Amino acid sequence: MQYERTLSTVWDDLLESLDSETRDLLDVLAFLNPDCISEDLLRGKPDTTSGNLTVNNSFRLTVMLSSLIRRNLLERNITTTCPSLRMHRLLQLTLLLNLDRRQEKRQEAFDNAVRLTRDALPRRDMTSRLPQFDAIWKQHMPQVLSLQAAFEQSNLSIAAGFEFASLLADAGSFLWEHRLNRIAIPLLTLGEKIVVAQLQEGETHSVLASIENFLAVLSAYDSVEDRRLAMQRLKRVVQLREGILRSLPDKTATLEQQIDLGRAWNDLAYIHADTEEFEEADQGTAKALELYKSLGDERSLRFRFAIQYQSIAAVRFGQGRLTEALDLSRRSYELCKSELGPRHLETARMEVEWSYVLIGAGDLHGALDRLMDALAVRSERLERDNPAILNTKYWIGTVYHYLDQLEEAEEYLRQAIEFGADSDLGKPDLARSQYRLALLLYEQRRWKEAVTFEEAALSSISDEEQATIFCDGDGRDKRKDITMEVLDRRVFLQNGRSTGPFRGERTGKV
């Protein structure tokens, strides 16, 4: 209490000198990221900050901001590329503490902050990915995270509805595309909680289906056990999507609503492919493709066909139908590149997944070219410890290992594990990379170091699985192969596999 009183004393005189409109604006800003509030965000749609402030009265907004800057309640960022403001964190805390004592004002300010942010951010359309919106999402993502924190940390509950949940769902989608899973999952979990609280028993809503879908896919990276839960969640998503379409009058479903159902079928099918249930995977991917063909073609729905071809390619790869898998992977990459351009993250993902099939076909140099291209794109767009970059480096190191270029292989494999558990790289992926490096070190007779990495990798699997390896493995080399296959199968299929049904026609090292 003494701390709160001290903070209030610092700012009270200045706050009391503000007119009501300017104070309302400051309360809204308190829910946003204090380090960088874009002025473009404030000049959004009419009536988003108070009853009198509108985009048509830009001059009035300028006057209010000037007043706040003059009183040192805000300051301009001079280092940012676009006009933005900064608020002292102690002032932000004071404003939020004051709002916690004024429930009606707090709710109004929060709703307006949500509306400002929602209006500034383009809605994520799963029909395609529009690359021109990426910069906008990246610029304003801190505001979404600030709203999430304010909502969760408020002393009193804040009401939130579908608009905020939809914003969280879209943010989760963007973060997943950038493989920022640790940030995305709490956002989506909060969105799910908000939507469920709004729905009556038996009710469905598209926002809930979207959130469930993203949570299922995100959780699939963590462990085999989580992928089993993801399969159950995706079955619910299919039911939700089918229920939404059934509830609509005939021929009134939008293109996106129908595509959302196809996505749900496809994502569930992909999890079946991950667990090597290829018959179910084949049925689900075919069902989604048939739906897309009824809605458009490769020209009108290029992105969705690209995604679908890549999913079917993974199934064909696992079925041993390599010629089909290679053709589908190539078409997937080309469609994605023509839709989004060669430097988009989704294009890079299609290129990496194409490389998995090339490895299975024994075209190691072709795979290496694809992986190097994708690494260049990902390194340009993502941080060094991003799991997409680390996974690409694992595969580059693995291809070099297959080519007996051990020095290059070691370099990339060490880079793949250098951040360890501190990155978003899933535990199964880290263990696989550690064991691949151990195999390389064993080849070089660097026993002590090899054992260290081998033990680290084996610590990620259960005693029962380790016992199975030693029972089935007749001889040291056989045990190494079985261990690599066990660790490889624990990795989510989207991150690639090179053993079991996904070994393909390649011969030589496991």
Where are these regions (language model features)?
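Amphipathic helix/helix-loop-helix segment enriched in hydrophobic residues with interspersed Lys/Arg
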Residues: 1-2, 43
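Conserved alpha-helical positions within TPR/SEL1-like repeat arrays
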Residues: 166-177, 206-223, 256-274, 300-318, ...
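Amphipathic alpha-helical segments of tetratricopeptide repeats
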Residues: 148-149, 192-200, 235-250, 286-297, ...
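TPR-repeat structural position
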Residues: 137, 181, 225-227, 278, ...
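C-terminal boundary/linker of central alpha/beta nucleotide-binding cores
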Residues: 11-103, 107-122
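Helix N-cap/loop-to-helix boundary motif
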Residues: 134, 158-162, 199-209, 226-228, ...
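Extended alpha-helical scaffolding segments used for macromolecular assembly and cargo binding
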Residues: 20-21, 28, 111-190, 194
